[in-house]
Amino acid sequence: MRRYNLFCFTLSMFVVVSLLGGCSGGSGNKEGQQPPPLATTPGAILPDGNLQAEIQGVTINSRPVVTFRLLDENGAPLDQKTAGLSVRFFLARIKDDGNYENYVGDAAGFPSYDATGTFAALGNGVYTYTFATDINDATKTLKGITYSATDTRTHTAALQVSRTVASKTGASFQQARNVRFDFRPDGQAVTTTREIVAVSACNDCHGKLGVHGGGRRDTALCILCHNPDLVVGYDTNSSAKYDAAGVSFDFKVMIHKIHMGKKLPGNVAAITAGGTGYGIGNASYATVAYPLMSGDSKASGTPIECTKCHRHGTDSNGNVYGKDADRWKEAPTIGNCTTCHDTTTFDAAVRIDVADALATVNPGAGTISYKAQRRAVNPVRHTGDVGFFVFDETFCRVCHPAEVTGNNSYQMSITGHHTVLEQSSVYTGLNFVILSVADALPGRKPVVTFRITDNLNNALSPAAVGSSFALRLGYLRQVDYVNDGMGSAGQPLSQPLETATANGDGSFTITFATAIPTTATGVGVVGMEGRSTYTIPATQKYAARTVGVGGKSIQYFFDLATGSQVSDPARQRRISVAAERCNNCHGRLGASLHDASRANNTQQCVICHNPNATTGSGAAEQTINLKDFIHKLHTGENLALSGGSFTIGSKDFSKVKYPRDRRDCLACHVDGDPPRFALPLPANVLGSTTAVGADPNNAAVDDNVRTTPMKAACLSCHDNISQWSAIPQFGILVHAPGNAADANGAELCLSCHRTGLLQSPDLAHRPVR
């Protein structure tokens, strides 16, 4: 019997460790710094180790010959014949209109790659590849284009190399590298480029692009095929492959429509009419919620910040990229603008077609069927078309220059039409300073002196009409806020500031209406937050409107034993997440939450969203500890329990699709040695309260029901492993009702997941390059 129990325990340990070993994720990843190599199986690869490649030259007679080099993740020559290694080549040229056209097409007549040519080894990882496609033969090339040795147009050869390998953790991952080589057939220097969007900008949100199976990771490669020739028509095979009435998968069209998502007018119209909106393959993008946060509801959730993508950056190999990034504002065309404004018409049309339903790819008996659908909807007539002339896009810049002289915010310029409130001249700034906190002792009412200014250092009143400012006072006994005796479910004291007394020097003073509990010990905090209102001027589309913008919240720490300020970061609440990293996707964290009052500082969030905080007693009570609900919120559609359901109040986050690899903890967490997300957690981290017990104001472990701290962190993403909670050997998986030891960390996670082991989060959660 003992042998059987030991076997079952060992098997259970193996299964649980396997479940905890990694997260499923999207297509994107982010590079991280490599820690010292671990003692593991010889030849095993770190999960961010990547291949290296370069194109050294291109010669063309009839079939292009590319000279290239392949190296493995250690910089050693890589055999092109290595099992599982995929090597593909692309060749395209820039037309006079600035778009690419591809020489190579697939059987269905769509832009593609060449991979059936001939390789020759030159030694030291250097090879030549001779294309199978004769680009001097119009019957062999896409659309019959041919090559000329005297052509002055820019040509781009590109290489995609990839393979799937096993990492040190035992999981498989894909190594991939995309490289390009620009040249002119006439031998002169390249002067024309199409470097409009650098993949480094994409990777701010996506971590690491990886589409078409994960091997295509650079926008410089994407645009060679995703050009205006890639149009999917209604019918099958050749009859509609270039049909202008089809759905375009040109890069700018596709990317703009995907990111507009549920804010795309065509999607709104199509869904209202009973359709499904824009989609590709089996994926629908009609409900995508763009993550930009703004106090302007017209902009929030919309990719209005064009420079988020259209800016100088680097390609996937770290090379400077983006020479043409300003074309978004310098070259307006009907085609470009209607990728987002897709129901706008520039003529007298009473109906306009928008993309609707998914494009399908159906392999048949020797043929491939591409099909996409459109739906006629009511258009929005462009205000510049006054009806007495045929609108031509050469007129666009007459009304819509790239910029106007002086202030461009909300002007007719291209820049002005894409204004983000918090980056505009309308928002004059909102800055907080806590000058002092007196009487900050248990049983006393703290007296706080503070200042509010704009960006020109002008003093602002906390009682200004339309403004709302407040202080939050909480305390931590060890490393987490507890706020015992202050408010229901771990909430801090709150003090509005409109009644503060002016001191005559631009500062104000207020006394808390409620005293600090006499039982409070440790380190206290006063957090300052608030918003002011601003008026966005009327535009051609919207009437003038008043909106709220919050200033960046700040914190002042003090010793509850002495009342003196605590400036030592080691005694303050630990910093686990950097708001700047959140802003890579969100623009301005919190700008559209809590009436915009709590913005741009996660250290303010945790004063309320602490381990003792819940949604309140009741049947649906759950923790709102920051790590728990933020992990769940971003896991979204990948949650396993309750059919993937996750709601807080009236907000349903069950359909959230995170845009990058969720294993990439450094997307949000600050780095460190060891990383802040590594195990063990800091000493004395509290478990997350899931039920406040009989007394909502008492967070003591004999009253609250908690989930142990490491379990709480892991289950917020790995929510499907709660099936193991019935195994008593795993303290990590046992709910801890009122047990002090369990509630504060009696867990067995470290036996398998401590830093330095293969299944440690800092290794198992390291995303691939």
Tell where the protein language model's regions lie, with residue ranges.
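Low-complexity, acidic Ser/Thr/Pro/Gly-rich terminal tails and inter-domain linkers that flank the onset
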Residues: 41-59, 418-441
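Cysteine-rich micro-motifs
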Residues: 222-223, 337, 396-397, 603-606, ...
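Sec-dependent bacterial lipoprotein signal peptides
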Residues: 2-21
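Extended surface/linker regions that mediate inter-domain or inter-protein docking
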Residues: 49, 60-331, 342-345, 355, ...
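Bacterial Sec-dependent N-terminal signal peptides
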Residues: 17-45, 49, 387-393, 397, ...
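Acidic/polar, low-complexity intrinsically disordered N-terminal segments immediately downstream
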Residues: 31-73
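Long, compositionally biased, intrinsically disordered segments
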Residues: 29, 33-36, 44, 54, ...
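Repeat-solenoid scaffold signature
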Residues: 25, 343-405, 435, 443-445, ...
